[in-house]
A protein has these predicted regions:
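TPR/TPR-like (Sel1-like) alpha-helical repeat modules
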Residues: 118-141, 161-177
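Surface-exposed cleft-lining segments at the edges of enzyme active sites
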Residues: 62-73, 106-118
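A broadly used, surface-exposed interaction patch
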Residues: 58-91
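Terminal, low-structured helical/coil segments at or just beyond the last alpha-helical repeat
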Residues: 163, 167-213
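Amphipathic alpha-helical repeat scaffolds
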Residues: 8-16, 24, 28, 83, ...
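Alpha-helical junction/boundary sensor with strong preference for TPR arrays
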Residues: 27, 33-34, 82-85, 89, ...
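Amphipathic alpha-helical repeat scaffolds of TPR domains
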Residues: 2-9, 33-64, 90-110, 138-159, ...
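Helix-turn-helix repeat elements of alpha-solenoid scaffolds
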Residues: 13-28, 67-80, 119-124, 163-168
Length: 213
């Protein structure tokens, strides 16, 4: 089986070139070599969502793409990845967390629509996937994390105990995140909540106490 750490190291080097298409071509190539692992599936999922969103923003800004069909390349690959992931890795924690993250914020990540997940059924997918996560990983804090972060529920973050924060760090640590952009985006997502969200929760509580006094 292809080594996901080696793949991420290759992606990291390609990202330093500042171009998207080389990363896409590399991921497409390794995707086709053998049945993709959960790690590769998650990486390709993240990367294509990020690229489709970025190219979409370029369109709004009127800036050029790297290729005339760049959006379609990423979108088609993204849908292939989602299909494979839902078929093979729906019960796996890392893939399940990532797809839950996207369906929870589907108004932003509508790029996932097209095959299994559509605008018409996304709310049902959201309900089903979070229920499956609760059933399969009842002790995990990571799936609870998603809706509270999306709602900027600072109070929830502030009320977490030190033991719960430690659990979150340990769970994220299981993913062995690397230096590539997508892994760093996930790390930043959790780090921000552990600092900025928690600090805002403290400030809101202090303000509330002052008002009550």
């Amino acid at each position: 089986m292809l080594d996901i750490l080696a793949i991420k190291a290759d992606v990291y080097q390609l990202e330093r070139q500042g171009k998207r298409l080389p990363v896409y071509r590399y991921l497409r190539e390794v995707w086709q070599k053998e049945p993709p692992s959960e790690g590769l599936t998650v990486l390709a999922l993240q990367q294509m969502v990020d690229y489709v969103e970025y190219v979409d923003d370029l369109t709004v800004l009127g800036e050029p793409w790297e290729a005339e069909n760049e959006y379609d390349l990423y979108q088609d690959f993204l849908l292939d990845v989602i299909s494979w992931g839902l078929q093979k890795y729906r019960a796996k924690k890392r893939f399940l967390w990532q797809i839950c993250y996207y369906v929870n914020a589907w108004a932003t990540f509508y790029y996932i629509f097209g095959r299994e997940i559509t605008k018409e059924n996304v709310e049902q997918w959201k309900k089903t996937l979070f229920e499956e996560a609760k059933e399969r990983y009842p002790d995990s804090m990571l799936f609870e994390f998603i809706p509270h972060a999306a709602q900027l529920d600072y109070g929830w973050f502030y009320r977490l105990t030190d033991e719960q924060w430690l659990q979150i760090r340990l769970e994220v640590g299981e993913w062995n995140l690397q230096k590539n952009d997508m892994d760093q985006a996930v790390q930043s997502y959790f780090d921000d909540a552990m600092t900025w969200y928690r600090d805002n929760g403290r400030k809101l509580l202090e303000a509330k106490n002052k008002t009550n006094n």
